């Protein structure tokens, strides 16, 4: 539904690693992925899709009838309060409830298989190493440790592809 809406409104590009289209002065690149934001923000003005959707007056949001969601704020978005606000505003527009976790918003410590701030002593052997480069058993253990904070009966809302893939 969202993709179809955007395709009617504007040209839709794919991943910035593959789609290398040029931008013109005044263009705004809407992004979903934090890596795309980081790639594009020096070339063109950027805005998250969440902010854009939140500002729409004509979008028909679904009614989620009070469904509760844990909100997993991405570590790569810790300095982007506009995204935190837009995601929560969208949940309200859909009649859903955000459950805030301890390390949320600017205090986020997790980005899927990229980053996790934890005091696990096993990480001392891997300084400044992205999680995806760690031994698989250690990655699994760290993901399980992080995910243990969530009640499995309540969905976790992730707006980062890495967080989503790992949770």
Where are these regions (language model features)?
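Iron-sulfur cluster-binding electron-transfer modules in prokaryotic oxidoreductases
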Residues: 1-167
């Amino acid at each position: 539904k969202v993709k179809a809406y955007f395709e009617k409104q504007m040209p839709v590009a794919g991943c910035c690693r593959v789609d290398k289209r040029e931008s013109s002065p005044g263009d705004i690149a809407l992004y979903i992925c934090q890596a795309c934001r980081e790639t594009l923000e020096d070339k063109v003005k950027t805005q998250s899709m969440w902010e854009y959707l939140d500002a729409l007056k004509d979008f028909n949001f679904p009614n989620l009838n009070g469904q509760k969601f844990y909100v997993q704020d991405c570590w790569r978005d810790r300095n982007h309060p506009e995204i935190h606000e837009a995601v929560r505003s969208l949940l309200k527009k859909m009649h859903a409830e955000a459950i805030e976790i301890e390390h949320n918003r600017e205090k986020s410590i997790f980005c899927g298989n990229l980053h996790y701030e934890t005091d696990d002593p096993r990480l001392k052997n891997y300084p400044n190493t992205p999680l995806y480069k760690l031994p698989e058993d250690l990655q699994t253990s760290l993901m399980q440790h992080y995910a243990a904070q969530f009640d499995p009966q309540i969905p976790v809302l992730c707006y980062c592809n890495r967080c989503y893939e790992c949770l």
